[in-house]
Structures are given as structure tokens and as C-alpha cells.
Amino acid sequence: MEANQAGSGAGGGGSSGIGGEDGVHFQSYPFDFLEFLNHQRFEPMELYGEHAKAVAALPCTPGPPPQPPPQPPPPQYDYPPQSSFKPKAEAPSSSSSSSSSSSSSSSSSSSSSQAKKMDPPLPPTFGAPPPPLFDAAFPAPQWGIVDLSGHQHLFGNLKRGGPTPGPGVASGLGTPTGTPGPLTTPSQTPPGPAVGAACDPTKDDKGYFRRLKYLMERRFPCGVCQKSFKQSSHLVQHMLVHSGERPYECGICGRTYNHVSSLIRHRRCHKDVPPTPTGGTPQPGPALPSLGLPVSTASATASSDPAAVSSGPSATPATPATSTDGNTTPAAPPGVAMPPSATTGGDGPFACSLCWKVFKKPSHLHQHQIIHTGEKPFSCSVCSKSFNRRESLKRHVKTHSADLLRLPCGICGKVFRDASYLLKHQAAHAAAGTPRPVYPCDLCGKTYSAPQSLLRHKAAHAPPVATEPAKDGAASVPQPPPPFPPGPYLLPADPSTTDEKATAAAAAVVYGAVPVPLLSAHPLLLGGAGNGGAGGPGAGGPSKTFCCGICGRAFGRRETLKRHERIHTGEKPHQCPVCGKRFRESFHLSKHHVVHTRERPYKCELCGKVFGYPQSLTRHRQVHRLQLPCALAGATGLATGQGTTGACGPGAAGTSGGPADLSYACSDCGEHFPDLFHVMSHKEAHMSEKPYGCDACGKTFGFIENLMWHKLVHQAAPERLLAPTPSGPQSSDGGSSGGGTDASSVLDNGLAGEVGTAVAALAGVSGGSEDAGGATVAGSGGGTSSGAERFSCATCGQSFKHFLGLVTHKYVHLVRRTLGCGLCGQSFAGAYDLLLHRRSHRQKRGFRCPVCGKRFWEAALLMRHQRCHTEQRPYRCGVCGRGFLRSWYLRQHRVVHTGERAFKCGVCAKHFAQSSSLAEHRRLHAVARPQRCGACGKTFRYRSNLLEHQRLHLGERAYRCEHCGKGFFYLSSVLRHQRAHEPPRPELRCPACLKAFKDPGYFRKHLAAHQGGRPFRCSSCGEGFANTYGLKKHRLMHKAEGLGMPGTGGSALAGKDP
């Protein structure tokens, strides 16, 4: 009997659901409440009225519970048990309800007979039970005519006055926290106003909407970027953008995200590969590791799961691995390091073991390593040509289909090979006043303005795709879709061109929402696997049913397809209210706002550099991550000396001596050095190429870390990155006495080359409370504590929870602040930082030029600017007498007379007169140019450029003009030649001076000269000009006439003063 009452309480007697009496605030959830209400189903008003009358007739005051008979202890629930509820004695029929499954298995035959009464009880005023209003999964609604009963556990205790639910009406869960708790009796119900027929609905509705308005207000602002949010949980999720944390990890592939919605969206890629727990067979329902855990716990879970480890990207390096989209990724050959397993490390960096190049994702590293191996796994089935990248294969396939896909314009008849170019061409007709052509449907006559819209419409007329019955639980195999009908914008196929190459090349047009395997030989174009196209039986990834009718690209969501189609149509619906610039995506518009506001809320904690976008800050942080000792040790293969704890030992973690106490050895010659900085400087002696150059002095380096340290020389002399910190209790073998595993043991287990794992171990994010891959604890106590601040600064004593936070903080003590502000006394390390700080004391630009109106911060800047309006040239050359505005211009000019080229390139021995010219020249050597011409020895970066160059030696003119048949070597030459065949442009004549122009740009500049003022005047004749360029040309005329200018002596060369 008690079990039945408990089941009744679970069905309708809980007091903490939506219709409960307590006034706890509405719980925070990451979605908009009003958006949720807009997507609910509505029930007929008549049915709700009948049910409301039935519920209102029930008594409002619960009676005392009866004494339960002795029964065995209740079973353990997987969900929170609910409080029992029993009405008054005058309604005996309402005391019985549906029994739970647990009571039917343990009670006597009398209780089993009561379990057969499954219908909900009704008050005695009803002669017959009313018809069922709702399904079992969706009980009667509690808030008007909106059915919210299926989502009561999401809304906590936000209540609205209404009829008290009866025993047969569900009212939510009894324990909002989701943990099992004790049963709640009616005497424990919190006090509140009486509800029922005597309640005032108007007064309670006011309170309800007042609470709803409280929830809709944005009361939680961000302290970094001042963005505000409605709920505190949204603010917590937003702060991950500034901190860079990615706590949600995928249990299958190991990718991490900073929002749970991004992880859920990513999980759709693995929906055909369900996670297999350690039991063997897949379990029904979503498991906790499959939904993603924070990195501190998910990594340990994934590492203990054999199935999860086997699904990582580097589980089977000897065999080709299958990616999430179903395509086969070639395995790395022997000698090439595979990226670290996604279940053991963070999100990077991943270093190449051959060239030490660092990548953020393991897929990028694997794609890069194909360059070293020379492997070309992607081959064309038409001409058997191989490529090392999938994108190169996609571009190559289009060359085979170029003869078939010729799309004519319906207005002028011009033919295009790409539908996107056709749409842009038709937009030019629309801008000129010519209406764009429409595309009618052959079946119903409906017209559309874009061809892809017609293709989606024709999918509705197509018959449904027949499927074969599944065998042994396997997925059903779709039948081949109907052939693609000839569209109104496609030319009919020529029967003479239907050979094997043309048939294979024309294989990829997607018809509506049904993927047609046009390119069956190249399923990579449609994102499928095997030869079955995007939806074939071999596809291991999710089906992409929404395909673009122009380029054939497939998408999994209709919204993504609509956004993609804007690329072809050129539609830009989002416009900037300040400058009027339009964008395709709202995200691009939000990024564009930084141009007008000049806000840079994202600041690097290491160097203080500010950025306007979080992506720029994330890319910038990768530069500093290479300064970590473990990152350097893992990326360059440094060997530690004997008797030390290694690069990742306690010394690096700030628990023992500083870097000077460690001995680092060069892996090439074995020479020992006190710290990593000297090792990196020494290893450059073994390198032949030094691609990183300093823009200030021209010195080159082999590592970008050395270049970063060198740039501090131009500002201040840097101290060491890692200072000694107080050491904690250590064991005799150098490890932590608390029993934790230090990072050196992790490196000894084969992870020394995996930079991402070493960095994650230093940051303390992969070991949970024990931190199996982290560093030892600083301070008192031998054990580790996940909540304590473990790393302390030896200079100021500030402590941090993670080692990365300590390294970030030590930059404050790294540089010497020698330049002080004369107004506030604040010191800075560089002159540029001091200049930026001085501007904060100036409220406005108070120095204005009386000639042109330009404003300046300081009087010295104004005086230098006023030289443009006068004849003053204080810096003159002693050889030719030419005058200059600035001394820097004079130093550059003197090279013309001396002929000195003091800057020499160390690679090709070429000399330059200026250091900036040498720095620009060195960029050519930094980029590899492996393609060499056998005839003249000229090198190129890409093979396509080499093939285009070799046409000069062969005399082949591959590009010909369509009008006159003249041949050219380059495409740019034929495009420039075809302008002569175009009709002459209309002559643009100025209405003020009747001067004619052919170029609209020059015409607009000329009109601006009439409309604006002429602040630049000649001192000889008083004529004014709109810019300095016109004034300079005018001065040359005076020189030729012999009028003379001050200090020139009649020399024509002196007229070239800048």
C-alpha cells in the first residue's frame, strides 16, 4: 500500500514541481525560456476546460497519512523518490493509484491485484471517467493550454498559481537536484498561499510575470568585455572564452570544447559509432563518457576504456585509420611520429619530429607529415594522377568535368563553367536594369530565381527512395536515386562526348536532398566513403542529406546549406549600421564592429598585447607555449644531464631549484648548459638554415623562440623565465613524497616527444586529484590537493593553482621597467608602451593645424606637419642640394650618391642599401622553392608555377583570345588583351571645367578637387591645390620656367623634393 502511495506521489503529489508551493528561484539553464515556450504543442481548449473543472473539484487540504503495514525495505531508485500524497477520507476512490514496478515484485497477491488498477482516480462528482486527454508520456498540462509536463525537471520551482494537481496529474520531480533523498510527507510541505478555486488568479499572474521579467533581464555582466547575460550559468560559459579553458571532452576522439553545445553538435559525427564501455557490447542510452566530461575526469575515464582508446586517431598506426566522416586516412610510414592520442593530451601543440613544426590539432600534423614521406594517397580514377591532399584532388576532378558543365547566361548567352560565376554575372545584369532570368519547374510551372532553389523544389516531385529490408539488424541500404533531370540552365549533353572519361567526370551533381553519386570514383567530393557516394553503405560518418545544387557539397543541416548558398548567390543580409558594409554571416558583422569601436578586450597575460577577437588571442598564445620547458624538450628532443630530474621535473614545476641547478645537454654534440635558453642558442650552430629574422637589426635565428628572446634585447635585458621557488618535501629519489607521479616518469613512459601531453601535464589538467601527469606540490604537506593553490612565485609570493598560471605571472618580473611617466610615475619596459600610456593623460588633440584643420597630440607633431604647407626643407643633401622634411629621408637619399650597399644576404650574397630591403628579400629564402626549371635554373614554390614558366622555353601559347585568336603565355596577359575588344567606355566630363576622363576613379578624384578646399598653396604664385601631389607637379613647372625656388639654384634635380 505504501508503495502504491509512493507511486501516486510520484505521479501527482510532489510539492516541488511546477505547481508546488515553494518559491525557490528558477534554476539557470542554457536556453531562452521564451524560445522554449514558442516550440511547445498546444492542446484543445475544450479538453483543458473539462480537466480543469475535474481538478478544481478536488479538496485542497491533504489529510494525515495512514499507518503503513510492515513491508520489506524499498528498493534503490535510479531517480529521486517522490513524496506520497493522500486526499481526505470522503474520496476513498482517490486513495489508490498506479503501483510501481518495484512494489509488484515484492508485495503479496493482494497488492498485486491492486496493481491492475491502472486508470487514474476521479472525484465522486463524476459518474463516468472522462476520455483520456493526453498520452502517457505527456500528462495533463499545468500552465494553461501549453503542455510543459514533459519538461518539468528543467524549470525547477518557477511556479504559477492555478488548480492544485490531483493524484493522477504529474507535477514534477520531488528532488530538483536529481539525487535520491528521503520521502517527503505532506506535513513537510513549505507554507504558501492556498491554491484552488478560492485563489485570485489576477494577483498570482502578476507575481508570475514579475518573476518571469526578473529572469529575462540581463543582470550578469562580464568583467572583461562588458557583455551581459540573463543567467549566471551563461556568464560562466562565456568566461571560458577569455580563460581559454576547454573543459568538455569527447569520449571517442578526445577533442575538447569550451561549450557543451559545441560538444553535442560534435557528437553527431560519431552517432553511427556508439561508444562501447568496458563490458564489450554497446549499452542502450547515452553513457556519461559519451556525452563528454571535463578534462580532469574525462581523460582518466577515456584512458581506462579500451574501446575509447582504440577509436583515437593514433590507435593503430600500422593500418589506415578511418576518420569520422568515413574517409580512409593513410597510416604514417615507419620513421614518422604519429600525433599523440586524443585521450591522453589536450588540444595541442603537436610537434613534427622531422622539422619541429608545431600544429594545434593532430589531424593537421598528420596532413603535414605526408610532405616528408612523399606519399600521395589520393588518386584520380580517370587519369590515375595522385595527390597528397584531398583538396588538390577536388580541384583536379573539376578539370575533367569542364567540357560538360557549361552554364549559359539566359540574357546574353555567355557560357560559364561554375554556377557561382553565372550568378555573379546575372547580378551584373540586374544592377544594369535587366531583370534576372527565372527558372520554372517543368512539372508544376512554379518559378525560382536561383537554380539551387529549383533543385530543392524538384526533390518534392521525386518519388521516395525505396529501401531494402534490413538483415540481422543492419542499416537499410538505399536504392539508387532517379537520374538527374536536365535543368533549364544546363546545356544538353552532346552524345558524341559520352565516353568513359566524360561519364566519370560528370558524376557529381546532387539532386535536391537526395545525394546522387555522380562522381562515384571520387566520393570525397561529397563527404562519403567507399564507392557508394555520400549515402552509400560504406559511409561510416553521419548522412549529409542537404546538398548544394551548384557545387555538390553536402551538409547535415538545412541551416548550414542556406548559409553556404549565400556564397553562390552573393547575398549579404547583415549590414553594418555605421559604414553600411554588408556581410554574409552575423558573426562576421560582430567581428567588424571592432573596427569602429576599436575595443580590444582580449589581453595576453604574458606580454600584455591586446586583441579584438578571441581567435587572435588563441593563436598568439601558441607563441608563448613554446617557451615552456617541457614544450621545448618535447619539440627539440633535448637530453637532460645525469642526476637531474629532467625538463619536467620538480625544478621546472617550481618545487626545487631554478633552471640554473639543472643540467641540459645538446642532443647533437653532448655539450652541457645551465638552462634551456643556452641550449636553444647553441643548437643553432648545427643548423644550416635560419629562417627567422629580426626586423630591427637583421639578425637571423633557427628557432622562433630565440627570435622572441632576442627582441627583448631591443627593449630591456630579460631575466630568466623560471625563477627558483620554495621547494616542498621531496623523497630521496627526487620525486614527490606525497605519492604522486611526477612529470619525468611520464616522459620516461614514451611521452617525451608528445608536446601536447607534456604541456597538459604541466598545466595540471589531466590527472584529477592525484595529477598523475602533473608536477609536484609546492608548500607544506606532501600530498596533492586539487583545490589548493599549488605553485607560488618566489619573487612576490603569489600562488597559483596551475603551473601555467605561474609561468604567465612571471612575465611581470621578467623585464626591467626603466622608462617612467613624468605625470603619474608609472614605469614601463619599452618606449612604445610609454608613448601609449602618455596618450591616456591627454583628453583630446588640442593642437590644430590652421591650414588644413588636422589635429595632433603634441605641439612638436604639429610643427613637423606644418612643413608640408611651407617651403621649409631643413635637411639638405650636401652633394645635390635636395631638401627633405625629415632626417631619415636624407639618410636614405645619400645611398644614391655613395652607392654603398652595406646589407648582404647570407644565402645568395646579394647586397642591399637598406635593412628593410634585405628583410623583405629574406622572406623569399624562408619559403621553400623545391621546383627548379632545368633550362634556366629558376626556382618556384609550386609545380603549377613551374609548368607555366616552362611554356616560355617551349614557345607554347596555351591561352588564346576568343575574339581574334591571338595566343598568350599567361592567363593574365589574355585578360589584359581582351579589354581592347570591349566596347569603349562612355566619356566622363566634368561639369565645372569640361575636362574629360575615361577612368571613373580619376573622375571621382577630380570632382573632389572641385568640391573640397585647396589648403596647399604655392609660395610663388599663390595657386592652391587639394593635395601635396598637385603642389609638387606645379613646382616642377616653375622650375622649368626659370622662376626658381629658395636654395635650388635653378637645378632641375632640386625640384624633386618630397
From Swiss-Prot:
Keywords: DNA-binding, Isopeptide bond, Metal-binding, Nucleus, Repeat, Transcription, Transcription regulation, Ubl conjugation, Zinc, Zinc-finger
Pro residues composition bias: residue spans: 61-78, 120-133
Comp. bias regions, Low complexity: 93-113, 172-187, 294-324
Keyword flag Zinc-finger: yes
ZnF start-end (C2H2-type): 220-242, 248-270, 350-372, 378-400, 407-429, 439-461, 546-568, 574-596, 602-624, 664-686, 692-714, 791-813, 819-841, 847-869, 875-897, 903-925, 931-953, 959-981, 988-1010, 1016-1038
Pfam families: zf-C2H2, zf-C2H2_6
Localisation: Nucleus
Cross-link Glycyl lysine isopeptide (Lys-Gly) (interchain with G-Cter in SUMO2), sequence positions: 801, 1039
Region of interest (Disordered), ranges: 1-24, 58-134, 156-201, 269-342, 459-486, 721-743
Molecular function per GO: DNA binding; zinc ion binding
Compositional bias ranges of the Gly residues kind: 8-21
A GO CC annotation given for this chain: nucleus
Family: Belongs to the krueppel C2H2-type zinc-finger protein family.
Free-text function comment from the UniProt entry: May be involved in transcriptional regulation.
Protein name in the entry: Zinc finger protein 865
